């Protein structure tokens, strides 16, 4: 199990991920900005958070860039536009083939500056409007449309969304119980 070094819990032992891993006797590693994990040809770069946000725990969520020879995924975690701005100002946000939209597509994340810097072909929004009726926020979907980013929303699939990369191009599938179905190219 991996978790971000920066969190607002009283101690590392109070972090829910740490407690869960310890309870199940699973190895646990704290990660921070600048660290990398290699898995075959895949490299996962931890981009942020750069600083602890004591006001909004969402901004302490890990932000990851997963690089493959075929393209890359930027996984924005739950970061809001505050953290986006900090990472953009630090120059650590890369272009990405696929962007996993931050904070479940809420209106406090995935600003124009981030989308302009990343220039993704596809964005994936992990949300459920049954649980959060305000997601995905119109502001977020409008920003993605402004930059001509194709969008997949997890609640539109029975199982999930699958993104495959080949030659710096993403193919995205809606996965239902009867198999996978390609989304618009």
Residue locations for each model-derived region?
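Non-globular, low-confidence helical/coil segments that flank catalytic cores
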Residues: 1-185
């Amino acid at each position: 199990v991996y978790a971000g070094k920066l969190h607002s819990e009283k101690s590392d032992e109070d972090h829910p991920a740490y407690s869960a891993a310890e309870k199940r006797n699973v190895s646990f590693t704290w990660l921070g900005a600048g660290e990398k994990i290699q898995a075959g040809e895949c490299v996962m770069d931890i981009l942020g958070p750069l600083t602890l946000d004591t006001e909004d725990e969402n901004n302490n969520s890990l932000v990851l860039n997963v690089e493959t020879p075929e393209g890359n995924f930027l996984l924005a975690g739950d970061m809001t536009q505050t953290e986006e701005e900090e990472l953009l100002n630090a120059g650590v946000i890369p272009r990405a083939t696929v962007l996993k939209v931050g904070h479940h597509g809420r209106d406090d994340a995935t600003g124009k500056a981030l989308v302009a810097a990343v220039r993704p072909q596809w964005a994936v929004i992990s949300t459920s409007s049954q649980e959060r009726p305000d997601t995905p926020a119109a502001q977020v979907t409008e920003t993605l449309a402004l930059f001509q980013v194709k969008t997949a929303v997890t609640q539109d699939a029975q199982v999930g969304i699958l993104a495959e990369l080949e030659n710096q191009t993403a193919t995205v599938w809606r996965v239902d119980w009867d198999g996978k179905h390609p989304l618009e190219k």
